[in-house]
Amino acid sequence: MFLTHQRVAETTFADVLTALWLAVDPMAPTEWFLDNLVGPIMDRLTAVLGTPMLGYPFMQRAYLAAVCIAVIGPLVGTFLVHREMAMLSDTLAHTAFAGVVVGLFLNSALSLTLSSLVTAFVVAIVTALLVELLVEHAGAYTDTSLAMVLTGGFAIGSILITATDGGISVGIDAYLFGSLATVSTANVGILLLISLVVGGLVTLTYRPLLYVTFDATAAQAARLNVRLYKRLMVVLTALVVVSAMQIMGVILVAAMLVVPVAAAARVARGFRQSVTLAVLADEFAAIAGVTLSYSYGIAAGGSIVVTAIGVYIITLAVQKLAPSLRRLDRLQPGHSEAGLKADGGEKE
């Protein structure tokens, strides 16, 4: 009798959980955000600018995804570049590709229903922690070890693809080169969530991360948990890389974390200003790149990266020309008060 009541209770509890899961749509907040906030803004811009592409739902998702990536990319990338870890983002992107293929391979071989994005997150995070563990024992990041991890991850992915006679090759191109059409509501929801997590954690741990980035020895002496903050940074990098992979592609996703930061470093006067300028540069590149991608039917990732490189070239030119322009300005008549008095005139 007791067993019967226990089974009924267990069944009822399971039914309640199932009903709650079916009743509460995990994507409902994202759909509400797109329909009630992003949609009306895009519709207004469509009316003002006369560009119908802003009214298409898939373009609204693409723009929102690009904007999110352009925020979290430099937010993490600035710390990476100043720690001379820029290659880590590329390494994690290629191992994340192996994670995608692992998920597709298991679904094909074992008839499972795993999300390839979940397996990509798992593989990227595990790889990030393993790389950090290797660094702790080696004492420094080495291009050789990162290159081996990068090529090894990509090699595993290619082996699994060919092991099924190309049966899982469908959709791989979208991960390699990025695609606007494949950015779903679920992708946007994940990006929004990761943006909040990454932004929140970087804000809360900004000073310790800054301390560890520039002087890990002094941070250790100040009794900061240097190992914890270093591992936190590589895990955040893995989250950013995988979440951006769908629109940027595996091959180009690292550029979102590196190129805008390099451009900002040319003109910034401090770390905080460097982060701000990198985000602004990345936002410009993302919005312009998505627009060019739709207008000319070219890859979104490639468009964004080429635009970002263009911004870098401009900042490089500004940095090189600024001293010459200042010298020319000093030679202009009436530049100094002494020059004005010597001429016997006044500045109008």
Q: What do these predicted ranges mean?
A:
Residues 1-70:
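Membrane-interfacial amphipathic/re-entrant helices at transmembrane-helix boundaries
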Residues 17-19, 44, 48-49, 146, ...:
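Transmembrane helix-bundle core of multi-pass membrane transporters
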Residues 78-93, 100-167, 264-276, 295-297:
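Short loop segments and helix-boundary regions at transmembrane helix junctions
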Residues 188-260:
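Helix-loop-helix "hairpin" substructures at the membrane interface of multi-pass membrane proteins
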Residues 253-302:
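Transmembrane alpha-helical segments in multi-pass inner-membrane proteins
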Residues 298-348:
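Cytosolic-side transmembrane-helix boundaries in multi-pass membrane proteins
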Residues 59-70, 113-125, 192-196, 243-256, ...:
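Structural signature of hydrophobic alpha-helical transmembrane segments
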